[in-house]
A protein has these predicted regions:
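Sec-dependent N-terminal signal peptides
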Residues: 4-14
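Hydrophobic alpha-helical membrane context
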Residues: 14-15, 49
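Sec/Tat signal peptide C-region and signal peptidase I cleavage site
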Residues: 16-20
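Subset of outer-membrane beta-barrel
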Residues: 21-343
Length: 343
């Protein structure tokens, strides 16, 4: 019965009733804004690699689970504009407090740079599977007398959608109509984004699924196919330092996918010495999440999130778990807490 329930949710998703949730939901986007906004490609001074697994709606058979691998880095980046908290470069002077914040202003005389990256995303919900790969590019242009940067980026790739009939349980008599759901589709996807960021803030916007592809795995709805809607994201955040050891990082994410109502995430993180952090995230009339993590060193960081529904879904599951592991390559400045820490 639970399998049929999951399949019913899937069918809603491809016939338009539930298509507002086409893309997987992550609560660790605060540690990997690159997932949502291609303009962040190459924002750091190093290659940033992240691996994450999300198990959603525990307690429900065949519940959704998602996996992603992302990697991106800069090209010809000579300044340290990505870091709000970092160690000084060798041979440079600067005052370092307990937060390892370099008072010498790294956001002066910024230079333009580029970034490239890529990602692999897998999303599974019972018999329904989605596997995508994409590449991204961004250009970061100094503005405001070279004290801030305005970046614009694009992500382009392919996604394979499929439905495995062998994972369904319809009894001994399988309807021939149902058996047609054996097909798979390979569709292109493009997203564009922009971000304005400075030493203590960022604001950005993204439009995803620009192609608004039509998906019909059965081949039965030709001429009446429902299309994937555009996803619109607005995001912003800042940092508030509380002395030399503590800092607060509030942020917000606004999402709109027609015909669903606007979704708003309000987030707050607190960090101690830029090594240990915890936070909460609230999605209006949908879910609340608790987040925690640590920066082990200048190479490895880990984040964990537990999300609990506040909608009617709370009656059918025991929450969602998400684990993220990050690796940093080419970190010549030994940065332990980069710009994305405020997401």
């Amino acid at each position: 019965m639970q399998k049929i329930y999951v399949v019913f949710i899937f069918l809603l998703g491809i016939t338009g009733v539930g298509q507002a949730q086409q893309k997987p939901q992550y609560n660790q986007y605060m540690l990997n804004g690159y997932l949502l906004n291609p303009a962040l490609t190459g924002i750091e001074n190093y290659t940033d690699i992240k691996i994450s697994y999300r198990n959603q709606w525990l307690g429900l058979a065949e519940s959704p689970n998602s996996f992603y691998l992302t990697a991106h880095g800069p090209l010809k980046k000579d300044d340290r504009s990505s870091s709000i908290i970092s160690l000084p470069a060798r041979g440079k002077s600067g005052i370092i407090n307990k937060l390892r914040y370099k008072e010498a202003n790294d956001f002066k005389f910024l230079k333009p740079h580029q970034g490239i990256g890529g990602m692999i995303i897998s999303d599974k919900m019972g018999p329904y599977k989605r596997l995508g790969a994409a590449f991204s590019y961004a250009y970061h242009l100094p503005v405001a007398n070279r004290t801030m940067k305005l970046s614009t980026g694009i992500t382009a790739g392919l996604t394979r959608y499929s439905l495995t009939i062998s994972e369904l349980d319809f009894g001994p008599n399988l309807d021939p109509v149902v058996s047609q759901y054996l097909d798979a589709r390979l569709l292109p996807e493009i997203s564009i984004g922009t971000t304005l960021y400075g030493q203590h803030f960022y604001v950005g916007a993204t439009v995803a699924q620009l192609f608004q592809n039509a998906l019909d795995l059965s081949g039965m709805n030709q001429g009446q196919q429902q299309r994937f809607p555009n996803h619109y994201f607005l995001m912003g955040g800042t940092e508030i330092r509380l002395g030399q050891e503590l800092a607060l990082m509030p942020s917000i994410l606004v999402k709109y996918v027609q015909p669903s109502p606007v979704s708003v995430d309000v987030n707050l993180k607190a960090s101690y010495l830029r090594k240990i952090w915890g936070g909460v995230s609230y999605r209006h009339q949908n879910a609340v999440a608790a987040l925690a993590g640590f920066n082990l060193n200048a190479i490895l960081n880990v984040g964990y999130g537990y999300e609990m529904a506040t909608s009617n879904l709370i009656n059918y599951n025991h929450g969602s778990h998400e684990l993220m592991v990050g690796f940093i390559l080419g970190n010549s400045y030994r940065i332990k807490s980069p710009l994305y820490f405020r997401w």
